[in-house]
Amino acid sequence: ELYTMNIDGTDVKQITDELGYDGGAFFSPDGTKLIFRSSRPKSDEEIKAYKDLLAEGLVEPTEMELYICNSDGSDLRKLTDLGNANWSPFFHPSGEKILFSSNFEAERGFPFNLYMIDLDGKNLKRITHGETFDAFPVFSNDGKWLAFSSNRNNGGGRDTNLFIAEWQE
């Protein structure tokens, strides 16, 4: 589950309360919203598999979608319904779009590319076009730069490096 609290550990508030694996949350630039990824089992078979793994202290986050809510947990809604793993969300500095990593177009679970989507779940746009792993996008506060992790240009290995790109609207 997701919680918020003051930096000194006081005023702990639970944000989510549903069966599943919630995490990777970020606040919007104005602090009024939270974006996060979640794996929420629905069928009896999925629920059993999830609980069996959880009993061993494990999770299998292969099916994840993005969720958005107000910073107090109200108005929770699913932002994506793309399938596969949609994760590593981050707000555009305008607060009106989300950049995230996904393999929803992949047939074999790979590659992961970066995508952008409006807060209403519309206007999905692919940002990177590779056959590698692109994830963990973070904008500079002024929106001029994008930092992200990728295993591109590494000679076919799995080492992940940090890339910084000038952002073009």
What are the residue ranges of the model-derived segments?
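Hydrophobic beta-strand positions that form the internal "hydrophobic ladder"
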Residues: 34, 98-99, 146
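Short loop/turn segments that connect beta-strands within beta-propeller blades
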Residues: 6-10, 70-74, 118-122, 167-169
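A detector of tandem-repeat and repeat-rich interaction/domain scaffolds
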Residues: 6, 77-78, 125-128, 145
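Residue-level detector of Asp-centered blade-edge/turn motifs that repeat once per structural unit
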Residues: 29-30, 93-94, 141-142
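CBM-like carbohydrate-recognition segments
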Residues: 138-139, 146-152
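Hydrophobic, aliphatic-enriched repeat segments that assemble into extended interaction scaffolds
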Residues: 24-39
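A flexible loop/linker signature enriched in serine peptidases of the S9 family
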Residues: 1, 16-21, 37-65, 78-86, ...
